[in-house]
From Swiss-Prot:
Residue stretches spanning the membrane: 3-23, 50-70, 77-97, 110-130, 136-156
Subcellular location field: Cell inner membrane
Organism: Pseudothermotoga lettingae (strain ATCC BAA-301 / DSM 14385 / NBRC 107922 / TMO)
UniProt protein name: Glycerol-3-phosphate acyltransferase
Record note on quaternary structure: Probably interacts with PlsX.
């Protein structure tokens, strides 16, 4: 019963579509703008840096909170794993948007910070560096998640396995991006330019 309850609570927390709701304040339907993805990067491009970065943070927080709470209450990797996976699945497949959500990067990052803060900072450092150098957010996200997963193994092998699972799920969600990266047709995102132009 605990597994089901934890899964449901975590799922519905993760399913809150901040990256859809906040752009709506500017009358922007994120599903019909840019890539159509209900995630922080598309919100950043479509609604500007302020709303975009707030969406990224909130998409992380909605996974961070349930995972941290349940990890403190139960102190058991099984409960923690259920909470983590379902929080990310809620973001990826939100019932409120007919199960069409994001790619799980920010929510997975929220899990990193909840269970292994240094892993969260590893992701951020990698993500920022690669995004600034290549302007490919998808590449930065994928590499960043696996870098965080690698670091996790040095602190807690169970977390390492969990993070690797979540990273793989997000990688699968990035299949079209990966194809475009291979074909050199992936859209670039100049963070500095966006901030200067629309800040």
């Amino acid at each position: 019963m605990n597994y089901i309850l934890i899964g449901l609570i975590s799922y519905f927390c993760g399913a809150i579509p901040f990256s859809y709701l906040l752009p709506k304040l500017r009358k922007i339907d994120i599903r019909r703008t840019g890539s159509g993805n209900v995630g922080g990067t598309n919100a950043l491009r479509a609604a500007g840096p302020v709303i975009g970065f707030i969406c990224m943070v909130l998409d992380g927080v909605k996974a961070f909170v349930p995972v941290l709470v349940f990890s403190l209450i139960f102190k058991d990797i099984h409960y923690t794993g259920i909470s983590s996976i379902f929080a990310v699945l809620g973001h990826d497949f939100p019932v409120f948007l007919r199960f069409k959500g994001g790619k799980g990067v920010a929510s997975t990052t929220g899990v990193f910070f909840a269970l292994c803060p240094i892993c969260g900072f590893t992701f951020l450092a990698t993500w920022i560096s690669i995004t600034l150098l290549t302007k490919y957010v998808s590449l930065a996200s994928i590499v960043g998640m696996y870098a965080a997963s690698f670091v996790a193994f040095f602190f807690n092998k169970d977390y390492g396995v969990l993070f690797l699972l979540l990273s793989t799920l997000s990688t699968l969600r990035h299949s079209e991006n990966i194809e475009r990266l291979v074909n050199k047709s992936e859209r670039k995102t100049d963070l500095i330019k966006i901030i200067k132009k629309r800040g």
